[in-house]
């Protein structure tokens, strides 16, 4: 979408103050000038960005499976089903982060990768983006979880994942988005441009 043609909707920052600076997140309160000329306040969180990987695996019978994780998420107080994901380290590019997160969290490395797109999960109050990658040609290896990271890795069929999405078992926004991508890739409606991995 060409942003230039929607200039009549753009808000302009006139002042900014930092409310909180943590190890991961920074919170700001900005004063903005609205398209009408009036002034409003916007509070938001600055996030370094993240990646999510949709790892594709074939079982012994050649049937497609996806690699998923179960992880406790403190803010919602629940164990969630998710695709492997993680935040960007300073100066790290998205593809390198995708490779690292897949290897660290699941132990898998992949011989082929495809970039699907970018997700902005919290547009009303965060700068966070999530780069979406598909991986195939998986090779098993050793996991290397971050200190304080606890998660289970398991596989499911795409049909099982879609059933869980429909039933409300999967409620994580990025995983729901990935399930939409997966469904369209499998059906042939959306194509991926695969490249050899490192």
Label every model-predicted segment.
Residues 13-14, 115:
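Residue-level detector of beta-propeller blades
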């Amino acid at each position: 979408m060409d942003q230039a043609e929607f200039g009549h909707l753009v808000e302009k920052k006139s002042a900014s103050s930092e409310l909180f600076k943590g190890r991961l997140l920074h919170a700001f309160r900005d004063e903005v000038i609205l398209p009408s000329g009036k002034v409003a306040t916007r509070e938001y969180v600055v996030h370094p960005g993240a990646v999510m990987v949709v790892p594709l695996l074939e079982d012994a019978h050649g049937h497609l499976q996806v690699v998923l994780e179960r992880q406790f998420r403190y803010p919602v107080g629940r164990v969630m089903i998710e695709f492997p994901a993680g935040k960007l380290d300073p100066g790290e590019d998205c593809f390198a982060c995708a490779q690292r997160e897949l290897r660290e969290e699941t132990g898998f490395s992949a011989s082929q990768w495809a970039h699907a797109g970018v997700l902005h999960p919290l547009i009303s109050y965060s700068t966070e983006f999530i780069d979406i990658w598909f991986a195939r040609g998986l090779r098993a290896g050793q996991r290397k979880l971050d200190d304080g990271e606890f998660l289970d890795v398991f596989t499911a069929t795409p049909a099982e994942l879609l059933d869980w999405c429909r039933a409300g078992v999967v409620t994580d926004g990025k995983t729901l988005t990935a399930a939409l991508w997966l469904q369209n890739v499998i059906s042939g409606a959306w194509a991926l441009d695969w490249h050899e991995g490192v």
